[in-house]
Swiss-Prot record:
Gene3D superfamilies: 2.20.150.30, Ribosomal protein L28/L24. The keyword Cell division does not apply. This is Large ribosomal subunit protein bL28. One of its GO terms (biological process) is translation. The gene is rpmB. It holds the Pfam family Ribosomal_L28. It comes from Desulfotalea psychrophila (strain LSv54 / DSM 12343). The lineage of its organism: Bacteria, Pseudomonadati, Thermodesulfobacteriota, Desulfobulbia, Desulfobulbales.
Length: 64
């Protein structure tokens, strides 16, 4: 699925833009996804979309 982290499942969330006059229009906050090469549990190298929190926390094992 597009715009979803393949490790943790984090996806878009919705809310409102609020102007100075308090007019509200719908908007989406998107996760900070990066395309990275990673090693799976079986040892294969695959490319996937992963959020930066998973990359920083070490949940992604990068190939040597």
């Amino acid at each position: 699925m597009a715009k979803v982290c393949e490790i943790c499942g984090k996806g878009p969330i919705t809310g409102n833009n609020v102007s100075h006059a308090h007019n509200k229009t719908r908007r989406r906050w998107l996760p900070n996804l990066k395309k990275v090469r990673m090693v799976t549990a079986s040892g294969a190298t695959v490319r996937g979309k992963v959020c930066t929190r998973c990359i920083r926390s070490g949940a992604v094992v990068k190939p040597a």
